[in-house]
Amino acid sequence: MARMGISKGGSGKEAKKPPLLLGRFEVGKLLGQGNFAKVYHARNVATGEEVAIKVMEKEKIFKSGLTAHIKREIAVLRRVRHPHIVQLYEVMATKLRIYFVMEYVRGGELFARVARGRLPEADARRYFQQLVSAVAFCHARGVFHRDIKPENLLVDDAGDLKVSDFGLSAVADGMRRDGLFHTFCGTPAYVAPEVLSRRGYDAAGADLWSCGVVLFVLMAGYLPFQDRNLAGMYRKIHKGDFRCPKWFSPELIRLLRGVLVTNPQRRATAEGIMENEWFKIGFRRFSFRVEDDRTFTCFELDDDAAVDAPTSPPDTPRTVDSGDVGAAPTRPRKAGSLTSCDSAPSLLEGRFGLGGSSRRRSSLNAFDIISFSPGFDLSGLFDQDDGGGAGAGSIPEQQKHTARFVSAAPVEVIVATLEAAAAAAGMAVREREDGSISMEGTREGEHGALAVAAEIYELTPELVVVEVRRKAGGAAEYEEFFRARLKPSLRELVCDDRPCPEDSGELSRSL
């Protein structure tokens, strides 16, 4: 009886939950660790989103002289936003630690799959296509990984590849005057011969060599350059001494012989790899756009919609300016805030088919209307603080690039005017499922392609409020589009007797 009483009393106590990390994240199991960091699975309790959090001790970082290394990794991850690269969502710090909040990739390392044996040819091809796509995207932005291997390649729950661990990466700014890198980086079995020689090397070519080794491993189940000791393996790498198994097709062998060339001047480029017949099987070039800081929307470039949409000139290289960056994800999905699609929706769908009604939101309340007035923005009183936001009195970036105006013009006229302004700037226009209009650039700048959203709200049966805001792309590019194209086109539609300011330090929140 006494034992039962003790047991009952113990079970009656509620288990004390551990405190939330930074007030937002419920930390789970340890996913992995290295010399300077541990990575945990975590969940944002407010949104339910699963993330991976990389935790680094500041003291270790400072003592090891890795401060510049960490800053470079942050800069690199912010520069390479791509559907096949693990995304950095935010960086936070306390007095003792630095935290990287990153995309959580559920499927784990590609290495674990290879360890069970060689992959089916179709799977190996798809992973290689996605790897080369991501690597080419990085190179076009002056970023070089320098440690490509199956352990640094993850697979998500949709079966798509994600390149991770840019800790050893380099940027073009770090090259010497000879245009080459001189730092030994990488894992010996995957390192190019010119890197082993410890002379200057072209980091792009070295990355592609590593991609070739990865392809061989995926298809064969073992390394192309093997020996009983490291010195013997180095000799084989320097000579390019490898043999392909009998199940490799002639086209695959031709591809590998072109990539695993010891002379970097003769080695296949990323574009050359993409032209190989074995590589092109099932390969779909696609463009993508980053929205809301972490959502990818992908569009195939080879479908009719993309051909009909305004595009860059035909002689523009397909791999950089147009955002044509590789193999499309396997199927439409939304997982971990990542949205992808197999094929592009029509960029000019539903031009006037909605009759205006579904574009209008008839539930504007008093707070909405007040917030439309400059100087009376109450959103800060109601928006949840994410803990990493701006300080009191600062203007959120989205509000800096948002404009609103009241109009008595028919919805169809407003939409036609928006489309004309977008077309004049070489942008495509499409209507989203929520009724908003998206104007999307076809060329990628440093911050990705420009994307501008326009929403039309019903104020009264005779009046509407039009809100225009930047969704993606650079602030300077948006400001140029707004002042040169959008404001002049919409001026006649504004139901307001106040003059429009021609010049101001930042964009006005009303036209």
From Swiss-Prot:
UniProt cofactor(s): Mn(2+)
Class of this enzyme: transferase
Note the InterPro entries from the entry. Kinase-like_dom_sf (IPR011009), NAF/FISL_domain (IPR018451), NAF_dom (IPR004041), Prot_kinase_dom (IPR000719), Protein_kinase_ATP_BS (IPR017441), Ser/Thr_kinase_AS (IPR008271)
- Please list where the region (PPI) is annotated: 400-429
Q: Which reaction does it catalyse?
A: L-seryl-[protein] + ATP = O-phospho-L-seryl-[protein] + ADP + H(+); L-threonyl-[protein] + ATP = O-phospho-L-threonyl-[protein] + ADP + H(+)
One biological process term from GO is: signal transduction
Sequence positions that bind ATP: L31, G32, Q33, G34, N35, F36, A37, K38, V39, K54
Q: List the disulfide bonds.
A: none
Query: What Gene Ontology molecular-function terms does this entry list?
Result: ATP binding; protein serine kinase activity; protein serine/threonine kinase activity
Residues covered by region (Disordered)? 307-340
| Key word Manganese present | yes
Q: Where is the Protein kinase domain?
A: 25-279
The EC number(s) attached to this protein equal 2.7.11.1
**Record keywords: Cytoplasm included?**
no
One Pfam family this chain carries? NAF
Which residue positions are annotated as catalytic? D147
List every stretch annotated Activation loop.
165-194
Tell me which residues make up the NAF domain. Answer: 321-383
What UniProt keywords are attached to this protein's entry?
ATP-binding, Kinase, Manganese, Nucleotide-binding, Serine/threonine-protein kinase, Transferase
Q: According to its UniProt record, which protein family does this protein belong to?
A: Belongs to the protein kinase superfamily. CAMK Ser/Thr protein kinase family. SNF1 subfamily.
Q: What is known of its domains?
A: The activation loop within the kinase domain is the target of phosphorylation/activation by upstream protein kinases. The PPI motif mediates the interaction with the ABI (abscisic acid-insensitive) phosphatases.
Describe its function: CIPK serine-threonine protein kinases interact with CBL proteins. Binding of a CBL protein to the regulatory NAF domain of CIPK protein lead to the activation of the kinase in a calcium-dependent manner.
| Stated name of the protein | Putative CBL-interacting protein kinase 13
What is the organism field in this record?
Oryza sativa subsp. japonica (Rice)
Per the record, the gene is: CIPK13
